[in-house]
């Protein structure tokens, strides 16, 4: 387990490390023994609510190659939810030293990611697979549980931001992937073409880029971030430029939801002071996606000289989504467009209360088409989409609206923001691509 000397901050609080976090919050800790049965009871209460059962099914879809009983699957899901809650709270205390009040409103903003978006960290926490505590019947009890965890965390100083802080907890609670063996996880040939392979031997230089396509809890990524940051700042680079260039240079993905949550948290902590003061909006370049197979182009959607279209499975029977290449190639465009959709989804739901469902859907699709086809000055994506790309996005949006009307959750947006990562990562050239991660489960 990574470990460093525990220190004390100027405020007199202990600066935790990976080992002390395991001691305080690991499987043998009083904190876990109190939180786990409460979380499990809350889940049992709402697991048949459609949006909760959907998140659980989607999470289960990422557990490929593992044969567990239904009881063991639920137990693991609750344990991973526990660690994901800790990650959110640690990140909040890293970015804001003020105490967490315990109010439901504040804790909800931490759980669903609104707090981090207000800090200009757009995608750190999305409406992911661990936000089931937002379900109204358990929201207040879930917030009380988070407040108890926050009170336990308040004894520590997280401002220093030890990057591998949560790695030990991840190793304790997350099962080792069946894909990993003593030989590590080989890099698929289609992605190896994106850059020189690196067998975790050396860290990138200040001007080199690195991709870790099986990033696990992010140990190699955060080491790369630290090396690039130190080298750039030592040679006098501007802090804003350093932040933006690091985010472009060090990127990763993983097919395990908790791994991505921990890797993003570790990446955030590794950025340190670059994100603790004012900075422009940023995306943390760690994505929930897999690389076992190349991205699939849907030839049936492509007509003549039209643009390429990629198909993404949902994990639900018969449900697939299509994204035009111009959107799939651009993580900023992905985040921006899908980040606008919650307003349209809610609008469709509100319209159905006063008009025919099909009329409501078409009205919202017309409004979104107008947005896609119009110039968007003073935004990250000022140019309108082509007519063909807009049509593809509208078909996907219609599917999302119909899903939302049945199960009002934004979890699909989380999936679709992340799934195209192999597309936009494969089309650029990284200086180094990590082809083994046997040291990082």
Predicted regions span which residues?
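Amphipathic alpha-helical repeat scaffolds
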Residues: 266, 431-440
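Charged, often flexible domain-edge or linker segments that flank or initiate folded functional domains
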Residues: 1-140, 179-422
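Short loop/turn segments at strand-loop or loop-helix junctions that form parts
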Residues: 169-172, 291, 435-438
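A short acidic, Gly/Pro-enriched loop at the edge of an enzyme's catalytic core
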Residues: 254, 423-432
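Non-catalytic substrate-recognition/targeting regions of SAM-dependent transferases
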Residues: 118, 122-176
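Generic alpha-helical secondary structure signal
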Residues: 164-169, 191, 195, 219, ...
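Catalytic P-loop NTPase motifs of RecA-like helicase/translocase cores
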Residues: 259, 440-441
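Active-site loop signature of alpha/beta-hydrolase-fold enzymes
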Residues: 176, 294, 440
């Amino acid at each position: 387990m990574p470990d460093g000397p525990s220190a004390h901050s100027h405020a007199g609080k202990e600066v935790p490390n990976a080992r002390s976090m395991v001691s305080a919050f690991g499987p043998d800790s009083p904190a876990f023994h109190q939180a786990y049965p409460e979380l499990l009871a809350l889940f049992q209460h709402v697991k048949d609510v459609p949006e909760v059962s959907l998140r659980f099914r989607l999470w289960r879809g990422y557990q490929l190659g593992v044969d567990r009983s239904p009881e063991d699957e639920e137990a693991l899901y609750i344990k991973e939810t526990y660690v994901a809650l800790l990650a959110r709270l640690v990140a909040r205390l890293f970015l804001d030293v003020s105490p967490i009040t315990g109010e439901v409103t504040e804790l909800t903003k931490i759980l669903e990611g609104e707090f981090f978006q207000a800090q200009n960290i757009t995608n750190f926490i999305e409406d992911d697979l661990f936000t089931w505590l937002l379900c109204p019947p358990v929201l207040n009890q879930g917030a009380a549980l988070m407040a108890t965890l926050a009170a336990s965390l308040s004894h520590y100083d997280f401002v220093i931001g030890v990057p591998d802080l949560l790695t030990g907890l991840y190793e304790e609670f997350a099962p080792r992937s069946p894909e990993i063996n003593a030989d590590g996880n080989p890099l698929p040939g289609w992605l190896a073409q994106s850059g020189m392979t690196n067998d975790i031997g050396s860290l990138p230089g200040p001007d080199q880029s690195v991709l870790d396509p099986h990033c696990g809890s992010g140990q190699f990524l955060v080491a790369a971030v630290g090396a690039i940051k130190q080298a750039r700042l030592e040679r006098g680079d501007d802090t804003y430029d350093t932040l933006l260039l690091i985010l472009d240079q060090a990127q990763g993905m993983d097919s395990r939801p908790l791994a991505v949550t921990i890797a993003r948290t570790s990446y955030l902590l590794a950025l340190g002071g670059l994100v603790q003061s004012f900075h422009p909006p940023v995306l943390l370049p760690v994505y929930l996606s897999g690389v076992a197979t190349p991205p699939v182009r849907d030839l049936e959607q492509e007509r003549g000289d039209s643009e390429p279209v990629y198909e993404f499975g949902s994990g639900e029977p018969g449900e697939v989504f299509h994204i035009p290449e111009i959107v799939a190639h651009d993580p900023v465009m992905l985040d921006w467009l899908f980040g606008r959709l919650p307003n349209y989804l809610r609008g469709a739901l509100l319209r159905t209360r006063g008009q025919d469902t099909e009329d409501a859907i078409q009205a919202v699709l017309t409004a979104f088409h107008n947005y896609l086809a119009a110039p968007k000055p003073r935004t990250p994506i000022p140019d309108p989409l082509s007519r063909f790309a807009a049509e593809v996005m509208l078909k996907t949006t219609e599917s999302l609206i119909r899903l939302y009307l049945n199960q009002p959750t934004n979890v699909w947006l989380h999936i679709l923001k992340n799934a195209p990562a192999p597309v936009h990562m494969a089309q650029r050239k990284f200086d180094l691509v990590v082809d083994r991660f046997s040291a990082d489960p």
